[in-house]
A protein has these predicted regions:
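Non-catalytic accessory regions used for complex assembly or targeting
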Residues: 1-3, 93, 109-111
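Amphipathic protein-protein interaction modules
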Residues: 46-102
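Negatively charged, low-complexity tracts enriched in Asp/Glu with abundant Ser/Thr
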Residues: 1-47
Length: 111
């Protein structure tokens, strides 16, 4: 595939619109993983609010990006940091597998 110099969104959830987005470029992922990502993102936004997006950086690193609407006083910033740390700890295997998948199938890296 062509090399992409921009960050690539894997998926995200929006508490304001109560919507989940999954990038169709990743439809090759097993359905169980897609469902696990949806549950993870939606539960995060139900817990702390805001918008959570899982984004691949240029080097294939998978990052959590959090944004909020201006003057969202209900957003739990401390809870957000704690929840992301918890997800990084409890979903380590999933997140590492997703990074490897992206590096091999999208960046063309060797194993």
């Amino acid at each position: 595939m062509a090399e992409n110099k921009e960050n690539v969104v894997l998926c995200g959830a929006n508490s304001y619109e109560q919507k989940f987005y999954f990038n169709s470029d990743f439809k090759g992922l097993p359905e169980q993983i897609q469902k696990e990502l949806q549950i993870m993102c939606v539960l995060y936004t139900e817990d702390v609010g805001g918008i959570l997006t899982l984004v691949y950086e240029e080097d294939g690193q998978l990052c959590f990006e959090v944004t909020t609407e201006e003057n969202d006083f209900m957003f739990d910033e401390i809870g957000s940091h704690l929840k992301i740390k918890e997800l990084q700890r409890t979903k380590t295997e999933l997140l590492e597998s997703l990074q490897l998948y992206y590096k091999v199938f999208f960046l063309g890296e060797e194993l």
